[in-house]
UniProtKB/Swiss-Prot annotation:
Homodimer. Its main location: cytoplasm. GO terms for biological process: L-leucine biosynthetic process. Pathway: Amino-acid biosynthesis; L-leucine biosynthesis; L-leucine from 3-methyl-2-oxobutanoate: step 1/4. SMART domains: LeuA_dimer. Its EC number is 2.3.3.13. It comes from the Bacteria. Mn(2+) binds at D13, H201, H203, N237. CDD domains: DRE_TIM_IPMS. It is found in: Cytoplasm. This is 2-isopropylmalate synthase. GO terms for cellular component: cytoplasm.
Amino acid sequence: MRKVEFLDTTLRDGEQTPGVNFSIKEKVAIAKQLEKWGIASIEAGFPAASPDSFEAVRQISAAMTTTAVSGLARSVKSDIDACYEALKDAKYPQCHVFIATSPIHREYKLKKTKEEILDIIKEHVTYARSKFDVVEFSPEDATRTELDYLLQVVQTAVDAGATYINIPDTVGFTTPEEYGNIFKYLIENTKSDREIIFSPHCHDDLGMATANTLAAIKNGAGRVEGTVNGIGERAGNVALEEIAVALNIREDYYQATSDIVLNETVNTSELISRFSGISIPKNKAVVGGNAFSHESGIHQDGVLKNPLTYEIITPELVGVKHNSLPLGKLSGRHAFVEKLKELELAFEESEIATLFGKFKKLADKKHEITDADIRALVAGTEIENPEGFHFGDLKLTSNADDTVTAEVLMVNADGEEVEVIANGKGSVEAIYNAVDKFFNQTVRLLSYTMDAVTDGIDSQARVSVSIENVDTGTIFNASGIDFDVLKAGAIAYVNANAFVQKENAGEIGKAVSFRDVPTN
């Protein structure tokens, strides 16, 4: 049975999601988890975009041991050079070169003829091949490109040395039948004495990304591209976890397998959710909170008698673990550290004291500390802003005029404290007015969402916010976790404002867009 490779582009295409801004440290942590999950290749970024993008690709390259690392490049030699430099430490480097090919892009964006684009493809894939053993080529907006011309494009890239041919449904335009036929036609008609691997790259604008990707696999695709949780611009990308589980459950139909370690799926999904600040919808396939819930009495009865009556995916398959022995108030440091190892949570030795201190505070509030509590505790530590001032504490006072006064304590790494006071019509407004007063920058709150990350009345809460830097239009997401939902919201808002502060200070610069028209 053939095996389908998985390329993850969460760190490149997934970061196109409005408000998602992974730090370099977060990107490396994500890459390590993706490798553990069984991803064959990680598209780590677009090295030519900015110094931060270059450095992220460089650090990820050095950190990977079994997974290939790819960098994106426009059909521009300087982009390919940037990929080469950033990927020098990669054990298995790959370069992904692309150019748009559809009529609308040829006429309005590139202002190039068909023949000129073929010449550009030949020149730049050849150049990339001179620096990399493995080159991937993508004709952007392939599904709106004339099929006969698309074959010419693909053949030109293959003749120039491309090993992987990616067929992007850039705007989520195609249908499963159409997309499957495109793959069938290209695979049957592309000529080469080397093995050429075709891959789908689907966006979900019409809600068909998963179906389209599976149609491509059914028609011969040997690699799939997508993101964890389906994050990405507009309606997002295909969710790789859905493809991995579909291939496992319907192996009989697709006659294909993968190297994805399915019981790492939930851990991978939750990590992306924490770092992106995007909560996983309850009804999300495979990893949503309701994926293994049954409201109907008939369904519940059936599941109790035999889970296969209404569950085609078992919780254990994707890594939903039943809680082992819980910790408690009397649990010591050793037991706590062993629990972190048991749950395979990443931590540095220097972080143990801080984590254990938070655990003891948690134990004072909860009788039993579950695995979910421990994961939330570590997650809360990870998403705090370690640089500059961060949220310390707050005090609220209700006033006679029905307003609320918030006293917010901000603390920096050196232990310096600053207290800011502000009023508001309600608790959240008062807290956020105080934070605004502290940062003294113009932002607009776009969204505020809350969900419970553990079970029970004493559950920890996660608040996710999205704010806009009014001066630049840039959107930033951030999250906060605490027993007190107001404190969780304060943490999230402070973290989001810290991103804005960095952008205003020039630490987050304007990156070159991979959609900018090449100058050569």
